[in-house]
Amino acid sequence: MAFPRLFSPLRIGPLEARNRIVFGAHFTMFSEPARTWGEPGFHGERLGRYVEDRARGGAGVIIVGQTQVHPTTAYQMTNNAAAWDEAAVPHFRRVTEPIHRHGALAFIQLAHNGGVNFGAWSKLPVWAPSAVVNSTEAPKVLERHEIKELVEYFARSAKNAAAGGFDGIEIHAAHGYLIHEFLSPRSNQRSDEYGGNLANRMRFAVEVLTAVRAAVGPTVAVGLRLVGDEEQKYGPGLTADDAAAIAARFAALGLVDFLNVSVGISGIGMVRPVYAPHLLGVYAAHAVKQAAQNVPVFAVHRILLPDEAEGILERGEADAVTLVRALIADPEWPNKARDGVPHTIRRCTGNNQGCYGNLTQNLPITCVTNPAVGRDAELGLGTLTPAAISKRLIVVGGGPAGLEAAWVAAARGHRVTLFERGDRLGGKIRLAQMLPGRSELSDFADWRIGECERRGVEIRLNTEATANSVLALSPDAVIVATGGRATKFGTSKFFPMPVAGSEQDFVIDHEQALIRADSLGARVIIFDAVGHIEAIGLGELLAARGTEVTVVTTLPMPINLDRETMGYALPRAVQAGMRWRPNTALGAIGDHAVTLVDTLSRQFEQIADIDTVVIRTNGLPNDELYFELKDRMPKVMRVGDAVAVRYADRAIFDGHMAGRQV
């Protein structure tokens, strides 16, 4: 076996997992909403199908999350799931039965989000141990009778979960949520028996664990999602050593069957983007493991490859690995590793756009690289069935949309030829991966190229497809994936375009700037009318090379980036020397000069001696071939940026659906 430690069984209290791969708890917003939108609902069929694919894909433990234990914590997301109501029990079975059907253990994460909550819809006060603000509103300090009530609700929720078929309970004591707040001296400033020294700060957690164990009995595993390090740079906070001390006490009390160790606090470091190193939380898991030798410890955070997971276990840093985004991207990650074909794993790139990015907009999660996420019943494992008739298909364009369409159609038995006018496949992914810290995005293209090769797609590089050359091959269907083009004259929701003077030769679009980064001159102005990564990334790239570069935008921040990505990308660029000018408009472009307008003060500023002005605005589709073909063939589809210039997740989804529709 390729990864013997990873695929060895693991004892977790009264249970045995078939391997050491844990699909970790996370928000999905796949719960079935209540009759009144905004009220908490229950887990159901959509979540059941989603977790079933991860069980079918080979994970040993599936931790369903996050599930709320009390009305005061049920409104952090629009579509939360409740556990305290006995009505949840049959809904739980709709999740546990599919997991068990494929031989995995079904765990559930029970949580009270404490001070991270807010009462915008519920109007309920935020409950926290102390008057320490941990979200957008100040909390109510918990009274003793309310603490007792919460202990009872945790136990009631656990009892319901066990009745619904869950094999294990994970109590959330991390990410800045309520039990974590009690554990930390940063957020627990109480002077009663629940505050002060470590034993007192642990008291609430001990009471919860004791009550939960009594509620579920000896056949159900009980453990913690434990804070491993708060990563507080500017004040007191729990460190890995503190986490080890806490873990040792829990282990000595015999209250935990496992410890799932993560670092950071909700909203500032929980879902690390592509810029973050792999294995970034392993040090904390290792510290906990050394302190709690007899308790299985799970490591988490950016563990993406089977080699990395096996190494953690081999070095004794943890007993199991918790994967979330890696299994969102590819549910079959475990089976592919077990079967000795890890090179076929569709990797998580840390893009964050569809998973964490959607959650921050109160939308169900998706995945840039896996179009099936959230649509698992329709597009998940086992749904890509052979076509009734094998057809001759031409795909024009070798970007992510075209590659996705090609491999999906070939997997269904069609005979596929892909034309790419350039000498390399990947399309605009190849530009995106040139931005600093974003090289891992290459897997969007590389995995699809591999699938095309494995499925027998004929690839013709350096071939410009025309309507006549396509028709000469007598295809049954054509998918036009010719992409889009950047332009300095595009439109923007945030600023009237084009900018006066942008027709001049020293004014270029952002793609030209990236290709010609070495020859833009000493002083560059970048105007960002979109609010995504391109302007910031290009600014960092140029600043690191010694260019005096200023990024100007009318926006207060890059609003189309999730806050985790923005929290890395913007500081990186500024620290490299990029000047950042938000709330600033590009008024006009003169002869190697620009006029800037502060949108708040309305003050003007003239800047001269500019070598290059770069404009990042919305692009235009390359749709000419589609319109030449659409009336000359019965089956012509266009996908991705050839429809409208959007993001990679839309392009890949378009390509996937087109490949299924041939």
Which residues does each predicted region cover?
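Short, surface-exposed connector motifs at secondary-structure boundaries
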Residues: Q290-P296, R315-A320, E453, L520-R523, ...
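Flavin-dependent oxidoreductase catalytic cores
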Residues: M1-V396, P400, E404-A411, R415-V416, ...
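Rossmann-like dinucleotide/flavin-binding elements
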Residues: S390-F419, L461-S474, A481-P498, E503-L561, ...
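Flanking helices and flexible, charged tails adjoining ferredoxin-like Fe-S electron-transfer domains
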Residues: L209, E378-A388, A411, R415, ...
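Rossmann-like dinucleotide-binding cores of NAD(P)H-dependent redox enzymes
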Residues: R415-R455, V530-T584, V643
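Short gly/pro/ser/thr-enriched loop/turn and capping motifs at secondary-structure boundaries
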Residues: G267, L327-D330, R424-G426, T487, ...
